[in-house]
Regions:
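Short Gly/Pro-enriched turn/cap motifs at secondary-structure boundaries
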Residues: 31, 81-82, 132-133
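A boundary/linker detector
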Residues: 1-26, 46-48, 237-243
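Short cysteine-rich loop/turn motifs with clustered Cys
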Residues: 28-53, 94-97
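Histidine-centered nuclease catalytic patch
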Residues: 45-92, 100-118
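Short Cys/His-rich Zn2+-coordinating modules
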Residues: 17-29, 71-79
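C-terminal, charged low-complexity interaction regions
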Residues: 151-243
Length: 243
């Protein structure tokens, strides 16, 4: 998961019209898809050969309980309806993350931490979501990878639990997605081994790593985690490893 500054996308709000089902607007869907280089905002799965799904981060029509977590049961039958046409609540994603498939999928789940109060139309900022939000820089920093596995990048117990819940709901542990991340990790591990043995130059190694960690690359957050874990300091110092 990479940080996505949605404010830079919302400057195009006037292009999307005023429809009652704004998330279906074709221009909006293209803008959201293109903004993160044709990738899912949650999983970094390339959106090649599949439609982009516009997810409502806070569900628009209903809210379902997840495990034993608190949730906004006061609006369980109508959801966060007042945010249905608010593009700041939209996240572009793939079918793996958005729909209930396999063991995960976001659907209408929106679990909350025990602290905080329920959000209402008049009071929007007091809920504490368990789901990590790619549009919140501090959330993105909590999640990392080790090989094809999702791991927390924090010792905080609540942070660890948020990573676990997000990995499950966003389907980050799906077999296909995990396998593709594993390929990225293995390729970088091999590249660094070739650099260490002198088979490739430092400049060649850095050039290939820059491609792998680029926001345009699939699963680039996993690539960054691999570089942080395995690369020597003289390589890391030449790279932008900010999520």
């Amino acid at each position: 998961m990479r940080y996505i500054k949605i404010e830079d996308l919302l400057v195009f709000r006037s292009r999307w019209g005023q429809g009652n089902e704004l998330w279906k607007n074709s221009v909006l869907k293209k803008d959201f898809r293109d903004f993160f280089h044709n990738k899912c905002w949650y999983t970094e799965v390339p959106l090649v050969g599949q439609d982009v799904h516009i997810d409502h981060f806070r569900p628009k029509a209903a809210v379902k309980p997840f495990e034993n977590f608190k949730y906004n049961h006061l609006i369980q039958d109508e959801g966060y309806y007042w945010l249905a046409n608010d593009p700041s609540n939209y996240r572009a994603c793939c079918i793996y993350a958005n729909r209930k498939t396999g063991g995960g999928g976001k659907g209408n789940y929106f679990p909350l931490a025990d602290d905080g109060v329920y959000q209402s139309e008049k009071d929007e900022n007091n809920e504490h979501p368990m789901l990590l939000d790619p549009c919140v820089a501090e959330d993105v920093k909590l999640l990392s990878f080790l090989g094809n596995r999702v791991v927390p990048a924090t010792d905080d117990e609540l942070g660890k639990e948020r990573v676990r819940v997000s990995a499950s709901i966003y389907n980050l542990t799906d077999a296909y997605i995990s396998n593709e991340r594993g390929k990225i990790w293995a390729s970088i591990e091999q590249l660094l081994a070739e650099y260490a043995s002198g088979d490739i130059s430092k400049s060649s190694c850095i050039r290939q790593l820059r491609d792998a960690i680029s926001p345009k690359a699939p699963f680039s957050a996993c690539a960054i985690a691999c570089v942080n874990s395995l690369a020597p300091d003289e390589i890391k110092s030449e790279l932008d490893l900010i999520l």
